[in-house]
Amino acid sequence: QRELAGISRSIVDDLWKGKPNELYRGAISKDELRRRISIGGFPSYAATILRMSENERSLQIASDIDNVLGETILPDEYLDKTIAHAVLQELLALPGGILNVSRLAAELHYDNRTIERYVSIFTRRFLITALPNLRSAAHRQTIARSKIHPCDSSFTTNALRRAGKDLAENPSLLGGALESFVINQIIPETQWSDKQPDCFYWREPGKNPKEVDLVLLRDRELIGIEVKSAAAIRSEDFNGLRKLSEDDRFVRGFVVYTGDRFIREADNL
């Protein structure tokens, strides 16, 4: 979105040191929000919005994904396209979900190693992003229990459409798709930021764990980002960030929501 608006500065550096505009006022309708999520950020989709119908874009996305799955990039990356499409469809239809390899394997009737192998291939081919849990020790950070996002939110809305699901009718799916959309705006910009941080999510263990959707880490400094699809923000929406702020490395935390104004919850929230 910032590239389309002609902003060359990375949002990642602004999250670290930028001064928020506390006088900001603005609003976005649910229809416009869903439209932006559906279009995503890839230039071939976003830049052709006026020339391409929704159905044409859907066919183009499906064709692009099929082409990526049909390429053998490395000798050991042979894949069965039937298995690949089945696994990818399940992952894309649950944006922001934490990967449960055993559950997915049971649902699709494949073994765990097959699921893990295909998820690894999808990440290398830039179809999905797998965020590890920051709370896990570095030597235990595997694909299992990663948080899965499409590399572009248009992939998810297309998968949901194929599954007969509609963001307009499912607030939970809208929340997950918005989370992926926001993360799609931030993670690519880490590559041209001054900080170039590593990306994680953060989640406590236990029955009712606190969680933060995206954590950026660089030089023992943390930035936390939580995403909410609601138009009103509550103090408890900052609970995950508050818990994360107990980490000595914490610098700032942000809640991205769909309301019309900036709200300061605390000096660093």
What is each model feature region?
Residues Q1-R2:
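Conserved AAA+ ATPase "SRH/arginine-finger" region at the nucleotide-binding site
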Residues G6-A159, A163-G164, E169-A177, F181-N184:
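Interdomain hinge/linker elements that couple catalytic modules in large macromolecular machines
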Residues S120-I121, L127-I128, P132-L269:
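A cross-kingdom feature that marks ATP-driven nucleic-acid transaction machinery
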